[in-house]
Amino acid sequence: MSQNSVTELTTTVLRKSKGRKLQDGDRLLVHYQGELLNGEQFDASFDFSSFEPEEGRTPFDFVLGAGQVIQGWDQGLNGQKLGEVVELKIPSELAYGEQAIGDTIPSNSPLIFTVEVLAVLPGGEAVPIYLDFKDIGIKTKKLGLTDELLATVQFTQTGLDLNDELNGRDQADLLIGLKGKDTLHGGLGADVLIGGKGKDRFLYTALEDSLVNEEGRDHILDFGKKDKINLQALADELQFIKKGKFSGTAGEVRFAKETLSLDIDGDQSAEFVVALPGVEKLKGSHLLL
């Protein structure tokens, strides 16, 4: 893509939302990532590949339409919605024009920004509006995402409407995949996992990723017919015994009463447990062993 190939401002929605529509005079709180057309990053508060904040960076706030940011932002974000993630392709005349910005942005450079709208303070109001789960299609009551579960969450990571890879921290995470073929790996801690629409994969790489006690186990809240749970890293040989009792053979995996359990050493007791609320039946095809 040549330096001058962006001739007009274009906006692509990477994550849809039904949140409040943005308008001039709103104070916005956003995360962003900026790149040149060659893919070279020149500034960012957030990495939209790892879905992690950049070290030492915090969200950025500004008043929409007040000239506090480049014209491409003021024009491209007007009419978008709270909770959306949008990609702005901005021609140079709506960016910095002939002005070079340090050693990072040459003169006459079109720019690409990915922007997530985290919150909005409407003009003249005193209380900001934050994203609601329902705005991005998460029906908390239907899924069983209770206040009690949310109270355990220490970190939330929400993907795009693409094929995302979400990796939790070593704590209790809430990972939300939304649309696309997503891979969710909560890691250590009692994680809450929501794949969303699409053929999702729930990855486990250590027994400690989901513990036996109720307070330490993961919850997969929306496991669907096309989803799979990957346990291949836990042992060389695993066998699914449906709802049968553990027989004393190492590597048996069973599912009963909305609970997936693994007896890794053949002692007829589980060393790994995942809760699947609302799932009445699990097939062998749902497991990667």
Task: Give the label of every model feature segment.
Residues 13, 64-65, 90, 117, ...:
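Hydrophobic residues in beta-strands and at strand termini
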Residues 136, 146-151, 155, 244-289:
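Low-complexity acidic/polar repeat-biased segments
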Residues 1-158, 162:
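Cross-family detector of peptidyl-prolyl cis-trans isomerase
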Residues 163-167, 172-241:
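Acidic, glycine-rich calcium-binding repeat modules characteristic of RTX/beta-roll
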Residues 35-37, 205, 232, 261-265:
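Predominantly extracellular/luminal cell-surface or secreted proteins
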Residues 159-162, 168, 266-268:
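Residues in Ca2+-coordinating acidic/glycine-rich loops
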